[in-house]
Structures are given as C-alpha cells and as structure tokens.
A protein has these predicted regions:
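A short beta-turn/strand-edge loop motif at beta-sheet boundaries
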Residues: 63-68, 152-155, 241-246
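Short beta-strand/loop motifs in extracellular/secreted proteins, especially
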Residues: 68-72, 101-103, 157-161, 190-192, ...
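Short Pro-Gly-centered beta-turn/loop motif in secreted/extracellular proteins
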Residues: 2-12, 94-104, 183-193
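Short, solvent-exposed loop/turn segments in extracellular or other extracytoplasmic domains
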Residues: 87-92, 176-181
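A short, amphipathic beta-strand motif
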Residues: 54-60, 72, 143-149, 161, ...
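Beta-strand-rich extracellular modules
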Residues: 16-18, 59, 108-110, 148, ...
C-alpha cells in the first residue's frame, strides 16, 4: 500500500481486514514523517499470522484406541464462534482456520459402550498455531453373577436374580445359564443390590442380598453359594435273605429337638 502527499507528523496505520486464512492485527503501527527531508520514503511493515487450528482427539482411557462417532461442541469464550464436530475413524476432528481466542470444548454424546465425560476443557488458540485437545473415556462397567453349590462348587442353572441400582433408576432381572452365570455389560456406574428371587425346586433360596459398586471401565463379580435340599432314600429288605421287599409303606415326618432352660 502506498500513501502519497503525506504531511509532516505522526501517522498510524491500523489493519481492519486480513486476507482469507489470516488473523487481522488491530495493533496500530506508527511512523513519524518529517517533510524537511525532501522526498524521503518511509516504510511500514505489518506481519500477519495464519488463523489457528484446533485438533480434538478422543481415545479409550484403558486401551488408547481411537473412538469414532463422538460429538463435541466448541464455543468461543472471547468471541461469537460456535460449532460442533464428530470424530472420524481415527478418533479425531480438526477445525482449521478459526478465530484466535479462548474456547470451551464439551463432549455432547459418545457411542456405546462409552460414558460421556462431564469435564469441559478450555483451550487458548494462538495465531499460526495448532492446539490439541484430548478426551479419554471409559466404557460402561459390567457385572458378573455366579451361582454355585456350597458343598461341591458346581454351578447351579436356573436361578433368577433382581439387580437394582441403589443410587439410580436402573433395574433388571436375569437367570443363570448352564454355567451358573449371568453377565450384564454396559450398565450404568453406581451401587447395586442383587437379590435372589427364584431357584429350582431342589435348591434352597438365599435370602441375603449382596451389594456391589461398579466403576467405569471395570467388571465386578458377585458369587452366591447355595445349599441343595437334602434327599432321603429308604431301602426295605428281607432280614434273612437281604432281598428287596416291595409295597412297604412308611410314614415320614419332620422332627426337631426342643431345648428348654431351667
């Protein structure tokens, strides 16, 4: 830019608009012009930096693998810029050539089985620089319930449990499989009460519930041991020959000892 026919005095130049992709610098640049020097030429130089960029990276907190499909909001604290982005297959999203300033980045939604991070991050973007913002998320926890015979350790199939979140609204019921196992994955973080509700006819119901706390990224195991109802076999034989005798009738009744104190 050339300014002609200037008069003596202090001149200031202020940038009002920068080329596309560059930051405008509103800092005045001053020069004193002395016309007594004749046709002397004065040169003023202004430097512009490229607009900054922001790269957001989203990974699994335990494995470090990228998490695609995460939606994040970006809002300027020092200006009016606002937008949202979704991480790609590599778990990242890049905003190029956005205004310099201070931004707040918030996680809005995540794919299953991850838990949304409630932590905002603040980042300052400086002209000509690319700043990284890294979010790490944990998977929702899992719960394993095992049911075993207290005498033999063998699994017990067909036992139904009620699983209730103590500090939340989650509730479900499930029944042990042939391995005596129930597995619930991707359930909310929190404290749970597990109550035995129904057992096969030969198993004695356990009336004492168990409680467990599930934290993000972990699987907890709760084991119930139950006694199996006893069985009674009666054999009737000939006292001389030892041969079995059929059609004998017996009266079976439950009895107990009664203790009294003096």
């Amino acid at each position: 830019i050339e300014v002609k026919d200037v008069t003596k005095g202090l001149w200031s130049f202020v940038e009002t608009e920068a080329p596309a992709g560059y930051c405008a610098d509103s800092t005045p640049i001053s020069v004193y012009v002395d016309t007594t020097d004749g046709n002397k030429q004065y040169t003023v130089t202004a430097t512009n930096y490229e607009l900054p960029s922001m790269k957001i990276i989203k990974t699994d907190a335990q494995t470090g693998t990228p998490i695609p499909g995460t939606v994040l909001s970006i809002k300027s604290v020092t200006g009016s810029y606002s937008t949202s982005v979704t991480t790609g297959a590599d778990g990242s999203a890049t905003l190029s050539a956005i205004p310099a300033g201070v931004y707040v980045v918030r996680e809005e939604s995540v794919p299953e089985p991850y838990i949304v991070s409630n932590t905002e991050q603040t980042v300052a973007l400086r002209p000509g620089k690319t700043s990284e913002v890294i979010f790490v998320d944990y998977e929702k926890p899992g719960l394993e319930i095992l049911k075993k015979n207290i005498a033999t350790g063998e699994p017990i199939e067909g036992v139904t449990y009620l699983i209730e979140q103590i500090d939340g609204s989650y509730s479900t019921s499930a029944t042990t499989d042939s391995a005596g196992r129930i597995f619930l994955d991707s359930i909310p973080v929190g404290s749970y009460r597990i109550t035995e509700k129904n057992v096969p006819s030969h198993v004695i119901l356990s009336e004492i519930p168990q409680e467990v706390y599930l934290e993000a990224g972990c699987t907890r195991t709760v084991t119930f041991f139950n006694a199996v109802k006893p069985s009674l076999t009666i054999l009737k034989r000939n006292s001389v020959t030892g041969d079995p005798l059929s059609n004998a009738k017996f009266h079976i009744y439950y009895g107990c000892l009664l203790y009294t104190s003096d």
